[in-house]
């Protein structure tokens, strides 16, 4: 549920129809709700989300924050550190144990999002169409995904959510990571993520860099290699924030 893409009424309707039926018996007992989501970028948006939740779950405490803060809390708890998201998109921050103190804007998959699924997929598709990979590998890719040049162009430029389409082909990379050309593609994108994002945080060399998301999780070995190449150290890598968030919200403040 992206808070920027939906009105308060649309969010309230979705919560009422998709969430509440699953937790109906618990709603009267709920005293606190912590919601982390994409698009929760300012107080106005967060207030709209809180009201949408309150319409179905009238808890005394409703806290709304970004998915990046969720990553920081899940990865670092109440300790300072660098927290990153590497999934379809990418993001990062310096977190002081309470709040996000610095954030290099990810800029999305056109201008940024280095190391993300969308960008890895974009590079892969471009390399296939421009014959930058071995011929046998290009043919294998096109056959595996039943794609051709015009289909790729249509999916990227004309159909909605081109970024998700590009991210959807990244399993090919991990399946063929032993191929030197594929390994270099992934390694260079991860290096770019560290150089263009992490190395901008003051004192970054004092902290390990922690990650959440499917790309970080499945490509952890190449990610660690990229980090070492630019003088960084990878710390915790998890696929999902839920366990870490439960642990965080169970801690005494």
Q: Where would I find each of the regions flagged by the language model?
A:
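Short, charge-patterned binding micro-sites
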Residues: 36
């Amino acid at each position: 549920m992206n808070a920027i893409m939906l009105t308060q009424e649309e969010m309230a309707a979705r919560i009422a129809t998709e969430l509440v039926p699953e937790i109906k018996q618990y709603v009267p007992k709920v005293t606190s709700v912590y919601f982390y989501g994409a698009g929760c970028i300012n107080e106005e948006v967060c207030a709209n989300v809180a009201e949408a939740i309150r319409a179905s779950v009238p808890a005394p405490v409703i806290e709304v924050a970004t998915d990046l803060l969720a990553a920081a809390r899940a990865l670092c708890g109440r300790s300072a550190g660098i927290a990153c998201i590497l999934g379809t998109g990418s993001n990062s921050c310096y977190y002081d144990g309470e709040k996000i103190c610095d954030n290099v804007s990810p800029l999305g998959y056109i201008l940024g999002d280095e190391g993300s699924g969308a960008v890895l997929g974009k590079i892969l598709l471009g390399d296939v169409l421009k014959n930058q990979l071995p011929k046998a590998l290009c043919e294998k890719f096109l056959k595996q995904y039943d794609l051709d040049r015009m289909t790729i162009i249509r999916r990227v430029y004309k159909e909605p959510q081109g970024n998700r389409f590009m991210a959807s082909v990244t399993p090919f990379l991990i399946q063929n990571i032993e191929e030197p050309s594929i390994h270099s593609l992934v390694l260079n994108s991860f290096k770019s993520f560290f150089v263009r994002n992490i190395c901008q945080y003051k004192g970054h060399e004092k902290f390990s860099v922690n990650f959440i998301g499917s790309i970080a999780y499945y490509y952890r070995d190449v990610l660690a290699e990229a980090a070492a190449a630019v003088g960084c150290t990878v710390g915790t890598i998890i696929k999902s924030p839920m366990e870490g968030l439960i642990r965080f919200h169970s801690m005494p403040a």
